[in-house]
Amino acid sequence: MHLSEITHPNQLHGLSIRQLQQIARQIRDKHLQTVAEFGGHLGPGLGVVELTLGLYQTLDLDRDKVIWDVGHQAYPHKLITGRYSDFHTLRQKDGIAGYLKRGENKFDHFGAGHASTSISAALGMALARDMNGEKFKAVAVIGDGALTGGMALEAINHAGHLPKTNLLVVLNDNEMSISPNVGAIPRYLNKMRLSPPVQFIKDNFEEQFKHIPFVGESLSPELGRIKEGMKRLAVPKVGAVFEELGFTYMGPVDGHNLEELIATFQQAHQIAGPVLVHVATIKGKGYELAEKDQVGYHAQTPFNLTTGKAIPSNKPKPPAYAKVFSHTLVKLAEQNPKIIGITAAMATGTGLDKLQAKLPNQYIDVGIAEQHAVTLAAGLACEGMRPVAAIYSTFLQRAYDQIIHDVCIQNLPVFFCLDRAGIVGSDGPTHQGMYDIAYLRCIPNIVMMAPKDEAEMQRMVVTGIEYTTGPIAMRFPRGNGYGVPLMEEGWEPLEIGKGEILRNGDDVLIIGYGTMVYPSMQAAEILSEHGIEATVINARFVKPLDTELIVPLAQKIGRVVTLEEGCVMGGFGSAVAEALLDADVVVPVKRIGIPDVLVEHATPDESKAELGLTSRQIAERVLQAYFQKQVSAVI
């Protein structure tokens, strides 16, 4: 059987180990070829090929439900659930998603993009199953660092308290998240990897004991206590943590040995109550370059399969915002030992790996634990440090209570640096950084800013470090800057709450925030070609808003347009409209940004065009709103 013939995972039933191994090779080939051509996540999926095949051969997927954590592990799952012929559309507009979406396929039982959600979801399904009197297996596959997330531990704590609820948790332990795992839990799991299989000892000890003449049967009542003692000898001195939490622990199992995996899963299905199967895998398995560089090959842009090197673009690009951010932060940290960079398992993505390499004592990686990262930063701030929490916009959502309760209510000087703010592209709706303006703007005490380009971002990094009155946040986008000149030192902080006028005109006031400032200027030039002259403001700050600049100009010009790369509901445009109403300035305000929709996976340019956020579309929308007679000139 060839992989292309598999349209339903139950077709794996009855296949021999040799046939499954052939399917495994074909999955890796297809996975590698697709990611090499189009980009995507590489290492996580390559590491779970045998795990997926072994697990699915022991389940009835017409009935049983498998919940995958951090959906980028699930590329093999997609390939054996009817998406082989569409796999070349991975992460592309109108193609299949890079993560899991309930609406994409009947075997995607729960959406996944952020980490640590699978056990909670699977437990909820298991409880509903029991309440409804149904019969199916609920399985959570968690790994790639997700077990370090507090939500996963909360779910384990709950599930372990339900001894009659059948739940299978499969731990894909590849010793990594995106970067190497950090913390006590990964260290404990590493010790478990080196220990003999616990379940084997428990099961075989009793069988061997009973064969001792005259003694075995008579001491049978004591076997339980003896087995518990043997179990503790078989695992690290930390104790059989999962067993103590109410789970039957099995493993560690070789995650690339199909015979061992199938036998273990078959045995696990026979055990009542919550079970955890610990599977030791190699991230990037089957592609030598990915096995050697598990961080670099976690996810890739298009690359040459032979050399492993990224395919160069046709023209050189300006530096990425994240690179400029990290370079500037390192320069400042070299001069100020109180600056502490904090990441939640995203050192490479945020650029804080550069701080780690240069100043390791001024760097903290907390693992996939955004809530802890924020309150840790608050504690550092209490003692006079300058914590810089570099967290993707989409992941900071997970620490909302901590932002309010632990930082803003106490007015602590934590500097939040929100990478990947705005439209992020092929990762899709789970990763779009659309909401941070709205969800932060309503919190007292916080200052919020966004740079128009990479040079202004350097000044904002200095501003954030020097602002010690309370919390401050800077959002910046994924991708490259504009190529403007950068400075190596001597950056001046910005005045808090002050914007700047970039262009003067009497017909319309355009106020851009962050990444939409340059499109504002471009739209103004297009409008000028049609006889419409715009004043353009770079707001710089949404909180506090520069009302001294904006309100008089709005009153004078009488037509206002706001531009933002974020949700318009409660966003920057709402802040401007509220300020004008509060000042009793009643003028029309056209808010342009991301409407009340989910932005699906596509390139950022494709998404912006679909949302009407290109400079030409902006000019057209301004003309439609305020200068109707001239619309046809642009169309």
UniProtKB/Swiss-Prot annotation:
EC number: 2.2.1.7
Domain of life: Bacteria
SUPFAM superfamilies: Thiamin diphosphate-binding fold (THDP-binding) (SSF52518), TK C-terminal domain-like (SSF52922)
Cofactor dependency: Mg(2+); thiamine diphosphate
Gene Ontology biological-process entries: 1-deoxy-D-xylulose 5-phosphate biosynthetic process; isopentenyl diphosphate biosynthetic process, methylerythritol 4-phosphate pathway; terpenoid biosynthetic process; thiamine biosynthetic process
Root EC class: transferase
Catalytic reaction equation(s): D-glyceraldehyde 3-phosphate + pyruvate + H(+) = 1-deoxy-D-xylulose 5-phosphate + CO2
GO cellular component terms, A-Z: cytosol
Cofactor note: Binds 1 Mg(2+) ion per subunit. Binds 1 thiamine pyrophosphate per subunit.
Ligand binding (Mg(2+)): 144, 174
List of residues binding thiamine diphosphate: 72, 113-115, 145-146, 174, 287, 370
Keywords noted in UniProt: Isoprene biosynthesis, Magnesium, Metal-binding, Thiamine biosynthesis, Thiamine pyrophosphate, Transferase
Pfam families: DXP_synthase_N (PF13292), Transket_pyr (PF02779), Transketolase_C (PF02780)
Entry's transmembrane regions: none
InterPro entries in the cross-refs: Dxylulose-5-P_synthase, THDP-binding, Transketo_C/PFOR_II, Transketolase-like_Pyr-bd, Transketolase_BS, Transketolase_C, Transketolase_CS
Gene Ontology molecular function: 1-deoxy-D-xylulose-5-phosphate synthase activity; magnesium ion binding; thiamine pyrophosphate binding
Pathway assigned in UniProt: Metabolic intermediate biosynthesis; 1-deoxy-D-xylulose 5-phosphate biosynthesis; 1-deoxy-D-xylulose 5-phosphate from D-glyceraldehyde 3-phosphate and pyruvate: step 1/1
Family annotation (PANTHER family): 1-D-DEOXYXYLULOSE 5-PHOSPHATE SYNTHASE-RELATED (PTHR43322), 1-DEOXY-D-XYLULOSE-5-PHOSPHATE SYNTHASE, CHLOROPLASTIC (PTHR43322:SF5)
Subunit field text: Homodimer.
Function text: Catalyzes the acyloin condensation reaction between C atoms 2 and 3 of pyruvate and glyceraldehyde 3-phosphate to yield 1-deoxy-D-xylulose-5-phosphate (DXP).
Family: Belongs to the transketolase family. DXPS subfamily.
HAMAP family attached to this UniProt entry: DXP_synth
Name this protein carries in UniProt: 1-deoxy-D-xylulose-5-phosphate synthase
Species annotation: Trichormus variabilis (strain ATCC 29413 / PCC 7937)
